[in-house]
Swiss-Prot record:
The lineage of its organism: Eukaryota, Viridiplantae, Streptophyta, Embryophyta, Tracheophyta. GO terms for biological process: cold acclimation; electron transport chain; response to osmotic stress. It comes from Arabidopsis thaliana. It is found in: Mitochondrion inner membrane. Residues 1-24 form a transit peptide. Disruption phenotype: Leaves have a reduced capacity for cold acclimation, appear water-soaked, leak electrolytes, and accumulate reactive oxygen species constitutively. Sugar-sensitive germination, delayed growth, modified respiration pathway, and altered stress responses. This is NADH dehydrogenase [ubiquinone] iron-sulfur protein 4, mitochondrial. Induction: By cold. One of its GO terms (molecular function) is NADH dehydrogenase (ubiquinone) activity. Belongs to the complex I NDUFS4 subunit family. It is a peripheral membrane protein. PANTHER family: NADH DEHYDROGENASE [UBIQUINONE] IRON-SULFUR PROTEIN 4, MITOCHONDRIAL, NADH-UBIQUINONE OXIDOREDUCTASE. InterPro entries: NADH_UbQ_FeS_4_mit-like, NDUFS4-like_sf. Accessory subunit of the mitochondrial membrane respiratory chain NADH dehydrogenase (Complex I), that is believed not to be involved in catalysis. Complex I functions in the transfer of electrons from NADH to the respiratory chain. The immediate electron acceptor for the enzyme is believed to be ubiquinone.
Length: 154
């Protein structure tokens, strides 16, 4: 079975691209040992934000969802310091540029990845371990089983 000219040309172009692109992909991976806080100094972050305190935690399962899509993720939240009540509207205001960053932006696949990110930026961190509830395996019919005679109250 012969392939049409367009398909043959596409296969040749794909093979050429694989040969050309492979060296660049391996060169892009650079392993480097960073000292604590080194990335923060190079990135242009102001000095007062280099010594921030953060909390690393694994968020609980959403009460309204039964799926496992967001389970196992770790997040970083900044400890907020500068808050005041806006006198006009009564809203809570902040002068902290990182006040709402952790809610959506800083998510990691593992606790170690979150720790290394915080260390590279020079942030002091505290890890909150996830609270896993103990679940009893039982069926609906267990609600109606005979549990013996009632015990007298003392």
């Amino acid at each position: 079975m012969a392939l049409c000219a367009t398909t043959q040309r596409t296969i040749r172009i794909a093979a050429t691209l694989r040969r050309v692109a492979r060296p660049f992909a391996t060169d892009a991976v650079v392993e480097s040992d960073y000292k604590r806080g080194e990335i923060g100094k190079v990135s242009g972050i102001p000095e007062e934000h280099l010594s921030r305190k953060v909390i690393i935690y694994s968020p609980a399962r959403t009460a309204t969802q039964s799926g496992s899509g967001k389970l196992g993720k770790w997040k970083i939240n900044f400890v907020s310091t500068l808050k005041w009540e806006n006198p006009l509207m009564g809203w809570t205001s902040t002068g902290d540029p990182y006040a709402n960053v952790g809610d959506s932006a800083l998510a990691f696949d593992s606790e170690e990845a979150a720790k290394s990110f915080a260390e590279r930026h020079g942030w002091d961190y505290k890890v909150k371990k996830p609270n896993t509830p103990l679940l009893k395996v039982k069926s609906y019919s267990d609600n109606f089983k005979w549990k013996g005679n009632p015990q007298p109250e003392n």
